[in-house]
């Protein structure tokens, strides 16, 4: 039988993903180019095989102008899944950004792409498809520069029995709830799309950090840099609105498309959607389709409470003309279960006004009917001007309240709070204000005609980035005025309990889903009227507030969840402060299918022991991250820039000298390439509070190497240093081939700290590892005594001062008297801009060999710093490795040392000295030279000691 592959002519491979290759093919009969995605099934896990088949079946059902065209798919010989899609001549968005050479896209073009992507995402979500891997490299461009969304390898159709909690995707685009291992829904795609638009606007990822801990911290704080000033405030506010930490407050795709700023683009590109349709695996009837969507969206305990649209294939619900209304007999203590009874009963009777009043638009999507478009059955509204004023007042009130990621149903409260800097949602019946980035005076009425347009240009207006449609679901509220609002403490405890409960439970079923919507619906009208009542009471204390009498108590008592804002949980990796430089990023090019969690509960992705703080300031609170990343070492790619770094010291107490000898931890740094690397730190000497058995590098703080000055004047009381056995120094030597390159990385040397005063000689050799400030700058060496922490601001000043000192001194001059001896509170550390490739592996191995041959021998180092009690600091010698004179002297000393060792038959030490040399050796010549000088210095000390001891014996 002829294979389908015979219809295509293979041209070239144009890409490679996590599971297969993308090949450009030419259809022989059609004479048209396509892309063949070939996924190999052999040697794949069952999950990967299932994912491949899922992608094949899913993309075959998806048809949309802004989603890659599907041609055909089949399984080739039982070994490969072949998927043929349309070819996008423009490449992907990531490539286009690289080719632009830093020239930003025009805002018109960016908004065009933004709108097209939103339409594609809206289409997917309306058909229950979660993409889960939205990123710039999966956004393709046609020759006409139109967008095509592709790569559905991680996409998932949400069903009633799905947990939707698998940790998949690309780290830089993962939403906070996914990183926190909270079940997530469609709002996770909104977050990822916001990251994409941010990156397309700023040419840099929205979130990047040294490692996973730093990335999680930034994502949890929604800490993004400023967007280029060439873009309008409306666009910036739209992007920021998509990156709200709490998924409940993120707008969905339909809401963003309703924003006035995007309307010209929506009108231009939406008409092409008339032919878009989807062929479900089985027909979705109205009741089951709505039930399936409701239950599947509940897989995120705090998402999609307002995204209740169904496709045009479904039977549309119409608000009945009869006068059936949902009444509340005891609104003071209405629970979700009580709401459920009303919702189910009304749904069975065909009356869905308690859930949502909807109408079909021209494209088959049911959309919420705004308050001014409701039938007469619904409760009367306030006049338009009053509603607009109340909306502004609601904004002002909502700004005072913050909601953490897991607090799903936090309501605005009148309790005074210090959370003034946190953006909070406003349940306001106006969708046009999603993207305003200013602050409006609460007491100033705004004309309704200017509210949507002028507020975007008002310098002081506040951004209500998330607005839900008005849902007056309970026409007549019957409040119980005899109820008393619970105290803030009781409410806080109730909310904490609910938050913990939500973290542990599985996604609820349909009753829970619909009850949340009804619960939310019942609250909106009361919220607005309550705000107006409060403001009226402030302006006219003597006038009783009718709105407050009618609606305040029912709103407060509608849920056991607190209306007091929960203190923001600040999750920062260390109490001493974490430096997460924006120039260092986790790779954004790898889809982390292997990052997916195992099903058993014994491998938690992250366990936050959080300490809540009363205000929202991002201070460094003690939080413990416990990681257990299964099967991550081969999948996760971590990149390191060589231009900046954060530092932390790991200290070893020295009870003999009182000097804290600081062990240097070399963290591996790599040029931004495609070589996957996982940072590992198994040293128990780190200061972070992590479990010692984790295999992942556990913190965003880098350690740095502490160097010593090479003093030409030996100290009067040098420190005796013992040699430790070789098993106490762990080194990684798996990068021998890459170290010799120009931008090769420092090999990490994990040294264990010990409470006793035994310190390995390796420390001193490591401290000689020199960093170059520039290509023509001399080596910077320093001694640190009792260093506590490193302050980057002071550090840079110290480096500049030292550079100025060195510029004034040549290598031939006498040693300068200026040296930097760190007091306990001083900070000094060279900033490595172009690090020398240093290999601690050879040095460590060589000294370990020495220690094995003479473990009990005590040696004094000629370049050990003086003791802290010595009033005169050691003299620093300016060393320039590139100086031919010094290099010649060092090489001469190396030859003399080798000859002496050979003459004394000390072959083991001779082998150690010569070990770094050779074609296949990773240690550079400079390191070997210093190694030789160090050994020679120690030998001279040994000879002097032996001579002095021999002369003393002769005298006796």
Swiss-Prot record:
ATP binds at residues 14-22, 37. This is Serine/threonine-protein kinase Nek5. Residues 403-416 have a biased composition (Low complexity). It comes from the Eukaryota. It catalyses: L-seryl-[protein] + ATP = O-phospho-L-seryl-[protein] + ADP + H(+); L-threonyl-[protein] + ATP = O-phospho-L-threonyl-[protein] + ADP + H(+). One of its GO terms (molecular function) is protein kinase activity. The gene is NEK5. The lineage of its organism: Eukaryota, Viridiplantae, Streptophyta, Embryophyta, Tracheophyta. Its EC number is 2.7.11.1. Belongs to the protein kinase superfamily. NEK Ser/Thr protein kinase family. NIMA subfamily.
């Amino acid at each position: 039988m002829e294979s389908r592959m015979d219809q295509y002519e293979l041209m070239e491979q144009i890409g490679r993903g996590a599971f297969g290759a993308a090949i450009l093919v030419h259809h022989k009969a059609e004479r048209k180019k396509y892309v063949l995605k070939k996924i190999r099934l052999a040697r794949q896990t069952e999950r990967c095989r299932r994912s491949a088949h899922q992608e094949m079946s899913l993309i075959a059902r998806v048809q949309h102008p802004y989603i890659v065209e599907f041609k055909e798919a089949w399984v080739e010989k039982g070994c490969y899944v072949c998927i043929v899609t349309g070819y996008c001549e423009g490449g992907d968005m990531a490539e286009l950004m690289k080719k632009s050479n830093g020239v930003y896209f025009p805002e018109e073009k960016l908004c065009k792409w933004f709108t097209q992507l939103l339409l594609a995402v809206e289409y997917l979500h309306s058909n229950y498809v979660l993409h889960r891997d939205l990123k710039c490299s999966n956004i393709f461009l046609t020759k006409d520069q139109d967008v095509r969304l592709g790569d559905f390898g991680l996409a998932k159709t949400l069903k009633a029995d799905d947990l939707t909690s698998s940790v998949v995707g690309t780290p830089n685009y993962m939403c906070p709830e996914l990183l926190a291992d909270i079940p997530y829904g469609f709002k996770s795609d909104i977050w990822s799309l916001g990251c994409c638009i941010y990156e397309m606007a700023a040419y840099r990822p929205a979130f990047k950090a040294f490692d996973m801990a730093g990335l999680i911290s930034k994502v949890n704080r929604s800490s993004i840099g400023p967007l280029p000033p060439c873009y309008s405030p409306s666009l910036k506010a739209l992007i920021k609105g998509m990156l709200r930490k709490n998924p409940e407050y993120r707008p969905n795709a339909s809401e963003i498309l309703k924003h006035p700023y995007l309307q010209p683009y929506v009108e231009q590109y939406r008409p092409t959607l008339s032919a878009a349709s989807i062929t479900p695996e089985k027909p979705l009837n109205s009741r089951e389709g709505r039930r399936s969507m409701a239950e599947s969206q509940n897989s995120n305990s705090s998402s999609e409470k307002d995204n209740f649209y169904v496709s045009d294939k479904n039977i549309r619900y119409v608000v009945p003309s009869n006068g059936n209304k949902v009444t509340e007999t005891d609104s003071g203590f209405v629970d979700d279960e009580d709401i459920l009874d009303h919702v189910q009963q009304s749904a069975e009777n065909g009356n869905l006004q308690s859930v949502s009043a909807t109408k079909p638009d021209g494209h088959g999507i049911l959309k919420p009917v705004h308050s001014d478009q409701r039938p007469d059955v619904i409760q009367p509204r306030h006049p338009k001007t009053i509603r607009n004023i109340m909306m502004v007042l609601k904004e002002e009130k909502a700004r005072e309240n913050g909601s953490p990621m897991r607090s799903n149903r936090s309501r605005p409260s009148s309790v005074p709070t210090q959370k003034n800097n946190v953006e909070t949602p406003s349940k306001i019946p106006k969708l046009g204000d999603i993207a305003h980035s200013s602050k409006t005076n609460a007491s100033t009425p705004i004309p309704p005609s200017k509210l949507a347009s002028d507020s975007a240009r008002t310098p002081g207006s506040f951004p209500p980035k998330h607005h839900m449609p008005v849902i007056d679901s309970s026409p007549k509220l019957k409040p119980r005025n005899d109820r008393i609002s619970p105290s803030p403490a009781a409410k806080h405890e109730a909310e904490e309990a609910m938050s913990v409960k939500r973290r542990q439970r599985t996604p609820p079923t349909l009753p829970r889903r619909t009850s949340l919507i009804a619960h939310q619906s019942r609250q909106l009208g009361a919220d607005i009227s309550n705000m107006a009542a409060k403001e009226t009471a402030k302006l006219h204390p003597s006038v009783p507030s009718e709105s407050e009498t009618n609606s305040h108590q029912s709103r407060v008592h509608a849920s056991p969840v607190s209306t007091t804002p929960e203190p923001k949980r600040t999750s920062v990796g260390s109490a001493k402060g974490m430096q997460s430089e924006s120039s260092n990023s986790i790779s954004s090019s790898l889809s982390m299918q292997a990052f997916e969690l195992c099903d058993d509960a014994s491998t938690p992705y992250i366990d936050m022991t959080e300490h809540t703080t009363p205000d929202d300031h991002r201070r460094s609170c003690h939080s413990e991250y416990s990681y257990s990343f299964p099967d991550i070492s081969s999948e996760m790619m971590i990149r390191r820039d060589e231009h900046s770094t954060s530092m932390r010291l790991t200290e070893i107490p020295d009870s003999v000298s009182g000097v804290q000898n600081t062990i240097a931890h070399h963290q591996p740094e790599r040029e931004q390439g495609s070589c996957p690397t996982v940072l590992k730190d198994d040293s128990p000497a780190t200061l972070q509070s992590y479990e010692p058995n984790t295999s992942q590098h556990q913190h965003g703080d880098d350690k740095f190497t502490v160097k010593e000055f090479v003093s030409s004047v030996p100290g009067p009381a040098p420190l005796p240093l013992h040699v430790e056995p070789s098993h106490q120094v762990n080194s990684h030597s798996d990068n021998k081939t890459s170290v010799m390159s120009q931008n090769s990385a420092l090999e990490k040397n994990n040294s264990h700290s010990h409470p006793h005063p035994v310190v390995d000689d390796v420390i001193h050799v490591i401290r000689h590892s020199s960093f170059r400030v520039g290509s023509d700058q001399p080596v910077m060496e320093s001694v640190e005594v009792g260093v506590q922490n490193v302050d980057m601001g002071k550090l840079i000043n110290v480096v500049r001062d030292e550079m100025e000192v060195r510029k004034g001194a040549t290598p031939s001059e006498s040693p300068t008297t200026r040296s930097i001896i760190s007091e306990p509170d001083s900070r000094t550390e060279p900033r490595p801009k172009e690090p020398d490739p240093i290999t601690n592996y050879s040095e460590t191995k060589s000294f370990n060999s020495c220690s094995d041959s003479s473990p009990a021998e005590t040696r004094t180092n000629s370049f050990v710093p003086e003791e802290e009690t010595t009033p005169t600091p050691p003299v620093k010698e300016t060393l320039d490795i590139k100086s031919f004179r010094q290099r010649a002297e060092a090489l001469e000393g190396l030859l003399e040392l080798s000859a002496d060792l050979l003459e004394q038959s000390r072959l083991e030490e001779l082998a150690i000295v010569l070990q770094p040399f050779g074609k296949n050796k990773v240690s550079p010549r400079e390191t070997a030279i210093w190694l030789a000088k160090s050994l020679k210095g120690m030998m001279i000390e040994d000879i002097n000691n032996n001579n002095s001891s021999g002369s003393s014996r002769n005298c006796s």
